[in-house]
Amino acid sequence: RGMAGGQAFDLDSVGKTLSLPELEFMHIHKTGALIRAAVMLGARCSNRLDDQQLSRLDHFAKSIGLAFQVVDDLLDAEATTATLGKTAGKDAENNKPTYVSILGISQARELAEKLQHDAYQALDSFDEAALRLRQVTDFIIKRKF
């Protein structure tokens, strides 16, 4: 369950072929859960948001959580060790299932863009109040490390 369950699923998946829903499940419960917790804790501290706004922020958090992992998988496959600050290509070397190994680079990139779009849409009703969250989304998608 939760982040620990996601990590256990990750460790158990090494060397296995996962379906896209299984990979998403794993990342929703790992990186996604951490990002979602950060967003939702901040949202709940405001005491000014209604249930619909909280739901939209939750959708935003889920979208950027998965987007972060998709981009991480793309960087592992495409970037250099010097750029990443960690060993590039380690996922493939360790036979770990990734968005790139399941979808390929082109479709993984398309998925990252779709998740970015979903995140933006979730923030539509917040107008300028969500500017920083849009900037975080852009950073996640455009980062090089």
What are these model-derived regions, one by one?
Residues R1-F145:
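All-alpha prenyltransferase/terpene-synthase fold signal
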